[in-house]
C-alpha cells in the first residue's frame, strides 16, 4: 500500500522510509504526489499535531497519510521543549541553535533525565486512523557528541549504550529510537487492520 508522508524533513523521511519499507509500505513524499503542505501545528499534544498533519495531507491527496510529531521532553524543564521542540527559541534558530539554547537553559542542572517522544498518526480515506506512541529514555548530555542524526540527537545520551543518539549508525538508531518504537506499535495496528483482525 502507498502512503504519503506528511513531512518536509528529508532526514525524517529517510528514517521513516527505511523502517516502513520493511512492512511492505511504499512511502511517498509530498513532492512525489505534487503537494506542498505545511499545516500549522496548533495542538498542545504530540497526538493532536500528528493528527492535524496527517489529515491535511489526506484531504489534499485522497491517499492514506502518515505523520509523525515528535520532540524532546526534559524532566527538569517540566517536559519542555515538548511539542515546541522544532520551534524552541523561535524561528531564527536551526537545530544547532536550539540544542545550544537548551544546554544554556540547563546550565548548572544536575538532574538531567529526558526522553524523546514520537507519535505516529496514519489517516485513511474512510475516516479511520492508526495512532501509535513511542518513547526513548535518556539523559541530557553536558555537550554535543556525534555527527549523525538530526535535531537534538547530539545532546541525547543513551546510558545503556554509552553514546549519544548522534553517535549511532542509522541501523542502530532505527532499532531503539522513539520513532522506531512508535512505528513498531503502528506496525502492529497496521497488520491487524490489513489482516482483518481489528473487527
Roles of regions detected by a PLM:
Residues 2-4, 10-199:
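Anionic-ligand binding patches
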